[in-house]
Amino acid sequence: MQTLLNFMSLSVFLCFYSLSVQCKLVEPIPVEMQLNPESMGLLDAGFPSDHLRKENEIHWQSWFYPGFAWPLNQLESRYFHAANTYGGGFSPATTLFLRFNQPAISNDLICMPPDCSKSKTIELINLTEGSDDYGQSRSVTATLSKVGFDEFESVLQVRPEGVLLKEKQTYALLVYEDFLKTPFQLQPSDVLKQLLSAQEPEVESDLHRSYQPLRQYLKKNPAHTKAVAAALVWTTGEPTKSLRDQVAHVINTSEKYRDYLIEGVDGELSTEEVCIIKGTWQAPLFLDKGPRLYAEGGLNLDPNGLVDAMEIRSIDFYLSIPQKAEMPTQGFPLLIYNQGTAGSATQFRTRGQVLEKGKTDYLTHPRLGNVAETAAEQGFAVAAMATYMGTEYCLKDAPYPVTAKTCPFVAYNPATPITVVASFYQMVLERILFRRMVQSITLESHQLCSEVASTQASFDPDLHVMMGQSLGAMVVGAAAATEEKPYQGIILSGAGNYGLGLALEFSKRNLGQLQENFLFLAQAGEITGNPFHPVWAMAEHGLSTANVALHLNRWIHSRELNTHVLVIEGTFDSMVSPTMQKALLKGLEIDMAGTEPADLPDSQRLVPEIETYGRQHKKCVSQNRKNVFTGKSFTHGVIQYPKDGILSGHHVAFQLPSARAQYGHFLKALKEGRAPAVGAEGCQSVSTNCSCNE
């Protein structure tokens, strides 16, 4: 028996010895990062990269994806033009790209913790000296997927994890020697060695100059130097500046846009709770032309690059005055409501709870549970206007015959990025001006319903809340983040980020697949299901100045933050995809409150995404966002409600009494001068604290 065991042991030893000898005979395949100092192409020296920018300028000099076939090369040029027309340099929200010089590397050969190595094989580091997170390591997700890069098989595509990158910061992507599994061996190229060398070259190139921050960092941290096999250095731009500059400009010129006419009481919309008054406002249109299918329609700019009204339109607006509440000395607190795509000015009164399936008039006929009456319960007046790209604009002012339902979606046409950005600017700027026009209004007794308790109606200049639904929520977010006069609170319902995903991931109909096939010649799901696809990066740069998440993220970390935030989301939203919901929440770096709906698929859950950027899920949140400059604390919370089975989750703010009660509590707290609390059902007095019944 012992002899048999000895024989078996010897056999196993010889077997392993034989394998090890064979392994030693396999030469590793060297892999290097493509670094061509003479090229301005995306895949020749990495993207984004500071060598593509002229010194002291934010714009870069290269196309996104040279060599792409028609029609993507046509779209690419439009997005590049949009980025350099309204953009502010490299977007903080984008995918990073670099190419290896071996064509046969598969995605399975990436070595990343925790599956492959105990140490980091790839990381992102902030190189901005003096920054709060200088030298801080950031985790990333990476792929070598060939989708979107058929001609270049080994393209490394990387997305930063956690909180968004910040504007005007220099970052480095560092890829280490053990990033690839055998038989491949990643190693620094001669060009990279020169770029990272402390020895100055005889002639300094743009590429060498762009790597200077990394050389300085490695000089202070020499332990990294030997292991770095690939690196990318770039500085994020300031895409939020463009819209902020335009907002500041229209505020300075707002007095010339305050002409209005009060037409009188709207008896059909008025109820025992609210008196509805209709008026018209002479509102500016800042676009040089409306979007015409594939024709771009941009902003009308003066010689200084600031918006100038192309024309003045007479548009409808409505005011809701509480019938039973006495007006406070300083005026009624004001809720400004912003409807969504194809919405009408009357939706603050007509959009309410639908009690049975199959109703098609849920946006046009007055219903209980509407914003006007919910706000009136807390003593708030409401103002709403006919927005650009709303139903009224489409039926009256659109530059071509079109139906009200299809007109607004022209503004989301992926083939016209200039229009996508300019349309968003128009909607934000008119909201900024509308607020100031409404503030100037005083209604006398003869202009009010006879049942109104007050003999006059005006509006408190220091208590403004803005609420938006769907696209309206995106506009509200951007307006709050760019306004010089803070809102006391904002309420975002059916909310998501503004960008390409509105078109490609429009949930109600399968429009994404149609656009993938028609515009991008891609297979269904090739783009919509793949955040690494270059089309997304193309849009993230081209549409960056209208990226609401970027505006909100800058705002929450700024001295200007002085506003409470409530976000109401629904499961299985038919209009806004989970991807766009999560992007907005990431921009806010917001905590989730309430009870997470049960039995959700992973794609619908918000909690995992919230945890990736360091926030929490609690039963109740209050005063959880601190302005580090002023020391003041504000409530920022999101609640996710289940759809009610009648309409999709896009409508929960109107369909569910619990959601209406939530924003009612929010308004009540603000009126009382308290910090609101956002909490689950069962929390006692959520307008004042977070005491909950377990």
What are these model-predicted stretches?
Residues 17-20:
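N-terminal signal peptide c-region/cleavage motif recognized by signal peptidases
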Residues 25-291:
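Acidic, low-complexity Ser/Thr/Gly/Pro-rich repeat segments typical of extracellular/periplasmic
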Residues 1-9:
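Bacterial N-terminal signal peptides that target proteins for export
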